[in-house]
Amino acid sequence: MLGYAVCHQIEERSFFFHDLQSPLCARCTGMYLGGLLTILYQAFHGRKGKFPPTWVFVILGSFFIWFAVDGINSFLQFIPGFSLGWQPSNLFRLITGTGVGLGIGAILLPLFNLTAWSDWVNRSFFEKWFSFPLLLVLGGLMVAGVYSQQPLVLLPAILLSGLSVVVLLSSLHTVIALMLTRRTNRQLTWFEMRLPLLIGLNLAFVQILLTSLLRYLLTGTWAPLDL
């Protein structure tokens, strides 16, 4: 249900571990795993809450544009005679999804820190010149590993892709919960964050449930889309 709520799950655009289909398509796999990778990458550098510098935003913005253009090109394949000039592939979908995922993570964790913590630091995770290029290298290695479809890499990636949906949605809803309950910048410890985190987690599952039910009502099936 985790993938069903956020992804079309078209078989031709998904990875398989033997007969086990990934819960997310190639593009969504890249997006959610990229977001999780970026959050974990930043998590070891303190409670920094300043957004990335302009040059990083420019690169991240180009990823979003590429994501949109490649997505449009993939959609046009369903219309005979329409194309933007290149053949869509799961590799392109995975790369563009990962690029957007890096952007989501690069914005979401600073937003979480500056909203949650009373001792957040007004510095960027990417203030050192090598921090962002290193993240790009890690993202590239992730893409190469997933696209290789080697069992030792693909199976953990499939499992983590589902987990990443919960992590990203819960983080976003926790930020919203902090704002709505007027608890921004009041916490010093994770123990003090237990209620906002619980609210965020529950809201994430409510969103997943409602979105899944809406999709079922519209399609009449729990199966992946068959276009």
Region annotations inferred by a language model:
Residues M1-S14, L20-Q21, T29-T38, Q42-L227:
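Secretory/periplasmic and organellar redox-cofactor proteins
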